[in-house]
């Protein structure tokens, strides 16, 4: 199936159906003009690193290292690279939703310059992630430390950009119930995952591992979200997005990369809905006021609540507050006051009695949330 759209044939701010799940062939800045404002949820950008290689690099046995010497990684000066970076970041910022985020990966050659442009343009840096490579290329000349990592910058569209996706609970669960850190350990792309041409040569010199993209998408997007990659290359972003139930749009100007990416993406089988369910924490659940429990008839004014050991008691009032020891307040405030604490989670502290069994009022909040979900709220 052809995924390719030609940038010059798409209208400015083309409708979603014209570019969704496709590869737009063309320069990234002009191609981005074809996308509407605020049309993508997450951007992953792997721009040229501007490696500034001065000649061939050889191993100790005099064999030549396959390094990045392609024309697309060559710029006349730092000023030219900065101007290029600013242009594509501005274009990306326009199409990114207000609650969207961007990931940019780079090496020490370019990531600091990219970070400066991100901040100057109003993006708000959330994290820098260190990708530690388990199998990095050696430093053959022995004149500096082995370069064993790359850096990712994760940023929201603006400082006040609230509501961006971060699947904290899922990342923690995937990390043996320990908070996931900002240093990630992955091998570079090798073996059967590495795309080769008919001569056995690498299709793309900087192909990223699918595991890296999968973690990025699982951390910062939801099924059905749109992932943009303005430097699509061999299509890792598109392949992972399709497998994980996300939409993608890639921009690439080199036909050999487009051909390889198209074949690769067409061969991907998406995961099922059950496998794509993202674990959420309480912070992701809709807020429920205690008065909602009463309005639903699950508790009545005058009901006596107590803690699970029946040491403290409070009476429910018609206005949704509790009263105990002559003082009135919220379920949280009264729970804290009766214990002499500064704070308390009233939902888990207070219990009601049903058929002789004490149950936390949080069970009633769960019923309300289920009703909200059923109603599509």
Curated annotation (Swiss-Prot):
One of its GO terms (biological process) is methylation. Induction: By CtrA. The keyword Heme does not apply. Disruption phenotype: Essential, it cannot be disrupted. Residues 271-373 form the RAMA domain. Its EC number is 2.1.1.72. GO terms for cellular component: cytoplasm. It catalyses: a 2'-deoxyadenosine in DNA + S-adenosyl-L-methionine = an N(6)-methyl-2'-deoxyadenosine in DNA + S-adenosyl-L-homocysteine + H(+). Keywords: DNA replication, DNA-binding, Methyltransferase, S-adenosyl-L-methionine, Transferase. One of its GO terms (molecular function) is site-specific DNA-methyltransferase (adenine-specific) activity. The keyword ATP-binding does not apply. InterPro entries: DNA_methylase_N4/N6, DNA_methylase_N6_adenine_CS, RAMA, RM_Methyltransferase, SAM-dependent_MTases_sf. Belongs to the N(4)/N(6)-methyltransferase family. Overexpression from a moderate-copy number plasmid (10-12 copies/cell) leads to enlarged, branched cells, many with 3-5 genome equivalents. Contributes to the accurate cell-cycle control of DNA replication and cellular morphology. This is DNA methyltransferase CcrM. It comes from Brucella abortus (strain 2308). The lineage of its organism: Bacteria, Pseudomonadati, Pseudomonadota, Alphaproteobacteria, Hyphomicrobiales. The gene is ccrM.
């Amino acid at each position: 199936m052809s995924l390719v759209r030609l940038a010059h044939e798409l209208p400015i701010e083309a409708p979603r159906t014209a570019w969704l799940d496709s590869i737009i062939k063309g320069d990234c800045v002009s191609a981005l003009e074809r996308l509407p404002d605020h049309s993508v949820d997450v951007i992953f950008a792997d721009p040229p690193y501007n490696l500034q290689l001065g000649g061939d690099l050889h191993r100790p046995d005099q064999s030549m290292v396959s390094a990045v010497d392609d024309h697309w990684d060559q710029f006349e000066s730092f000023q030219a690279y900065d101007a290029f970076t600013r242009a594509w970041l501005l274009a990306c910022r326009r199409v990114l939703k207000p609650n969207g985020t961007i990931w940019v990966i780079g090496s020490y050659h370019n990531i600091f310059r990219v970070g400066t442009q991100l901040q100057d343009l109003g993006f708000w840096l959330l994290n820098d992630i260190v990708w530690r490579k388990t199998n990095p290329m050696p430093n053959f000349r022995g004149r500096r430390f082995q370069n064993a990592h790359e850096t990712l910058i994760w940023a929201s569209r603006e400082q006040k950009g609230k509501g961006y996706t971060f699947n904290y609970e899922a990342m923690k669960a995937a990390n043996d119930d320990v908070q996931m850190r900002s240093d990630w350990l992955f091998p570079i792309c090798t073996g059967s995952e590495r795309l080769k041409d008919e001569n056995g040569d690498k299709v793309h010199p900087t192909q990223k591992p699918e595991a890296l993209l999968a973690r990025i998408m699982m951390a910062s997007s939801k099924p059905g979200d749109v992932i943009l990659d303005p430097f699509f290359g061999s299509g890792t972003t598109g392949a992972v997005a399709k497998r994980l139930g996300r939409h993608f749009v890639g921009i690439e100007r080199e036909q050999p990369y487009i051909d390889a990416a198209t074949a690769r993406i067409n061969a991907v089988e998406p995961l099922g809905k059950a496998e794509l369910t993202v674990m959420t924490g309480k912070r992701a659940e809709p807020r429920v006021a205690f008065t909602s429990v009463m309005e639903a008839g699950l508790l009545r004014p005058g009901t006596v609540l107590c803690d699970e050991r029946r040491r403290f008691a409070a009476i429910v009032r018609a206005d949704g507050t509790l009263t105990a020891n002559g003082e009135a307040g919220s379920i949280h405030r009264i729970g804290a006051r009766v214990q002499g604490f500064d704070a308390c989670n009233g939902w888990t502290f207070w219990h009601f009695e049903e058929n002789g069994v004490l149950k936390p009022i949080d069970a009633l909040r769960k019923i309300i949330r289920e009703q909200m979900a059923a109603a599509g709220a």
